[in-house]
C-alpha cells in the first residue's frame, strides 16, 4: 500500500488508469465512472488553547472572530478555504497571519500563542483544544472516498476500501 499526493487535475486519469486505487478528497471528480461516498463529515469550529482569552467568553461574535490571528491550512500556495468562501459572502475577511500545509503542526502553535484555527470539532477534541461555535454559517467539512467503477468487484479493493472507511470513522470518534 502506498499513499501520496496527486494533483486534482490528474486524479481522473490516475483513477481510470489504475495508477491510483482511491482518492480521499473534499472535491472528488464528478464523472459517472467515478464512484464516491462520504467517509467523514464534521462541523467547523474555532479552536484555541484552553487558557486563551476566548475560553472565558460565552459566545464568539463575528467581529471577535475577524479580529483574531488565524492559522490557515492549505496544500495550495494561494486561495481560501470553505470558511473563507463563507466569509466572502458576508463581504468580510479573517486575518490570516500564518499559512501552513498541514494541520499536524497547529496544536503546538496554538498551545503557545493566541492564534486560532478554524478546524473540525473532531480535530479540536482530539488535540484537547478549547473551541467555540463559528458565528456564521459554513458548510461542514466533508471528505469523500473516490474510486474507479472498474474496481467495484475486486476483493482487495473492497477490503482496502473498508479499512479506509473504518479508519476515518475511528478518527472522528477519538
What does each of the following model-derived ranges do?
Residues 31-70, 154-158:
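Flexible hinge/capping segments at coil-to-helix
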Residues 15-24, 44, 92, 110-117:
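Alpha-to-beta junction loops
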Residues 32-38, 42-43, 104-152:
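Beta-alpha-beta core module
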Residues 1-31, 99-100:
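Central regulatory/effector-binding core of bacterial HTH transcription factors
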Residues 1-4, 12-19, 85-89, 162, ...:
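Short alpha-helix C-terminal cap/hinge motif
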Residues 7, 61, 101-102, 120:
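Short loop/turn segments at beta->alpha junctions
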Residues 54-55, 68-90, 153-161, 171:
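Secondary-structure junction motif
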Residues 9-12, 16, 36, 62, ...:
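Short hydrophobic/charged patches on amphipathic alpha-helices used for structural packing
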Amino acid at each position: 500500500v502506498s499513499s501520496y499526493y496527486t494533483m486534482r487535475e490528474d486524479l481522473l486519469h490516475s483513477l481510470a488508469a489504475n495508477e491510483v486505487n482511491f482518492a480521499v478528497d473534499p472535491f472528488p471528480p464528478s464523472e459517472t465512472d467515478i464512484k464516491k461516498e462520504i467517509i467523514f463529515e464534521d462541523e467547523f469550529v474555532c479552536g484555541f488553547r484552553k487558557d486563551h482569552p476566548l475560553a472565558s467568553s460565552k459566545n464568539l461574535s463575528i467581529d471577535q472572530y475577524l479580529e483574531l490571528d488565524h492559522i490557515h491550512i492549505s496544500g495550495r500556495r494561494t486561495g481560501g478555504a470553505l470558511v473563507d468562501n463563507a466569509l466572502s459572502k458576508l463581504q468580510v475577511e479573517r486575518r490570516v497571519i500564518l499559512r501552513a500545509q498541514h494541520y499536524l503542526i497547529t496544536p503546538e502553535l496554538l498551545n503557545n500563542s493566541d492564534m486560532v484555527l478554524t478546524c473540525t470539532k473532531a480535530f479540536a477534541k482530539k488535540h484537547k483544544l478549547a473551541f467555540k461555535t463559528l458565528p456564521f454559517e459554513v458548510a461542514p467539512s466533508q471528505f469523500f472516498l473516490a474510486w474507479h467503477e472498474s474496481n467495484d468487484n475486486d476483493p482487495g479493493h473492497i477490503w482496502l476500501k473498508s479499512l479506509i472507511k473504518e479508519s476515518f470513522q475511528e478518527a472522528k470518534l477519538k
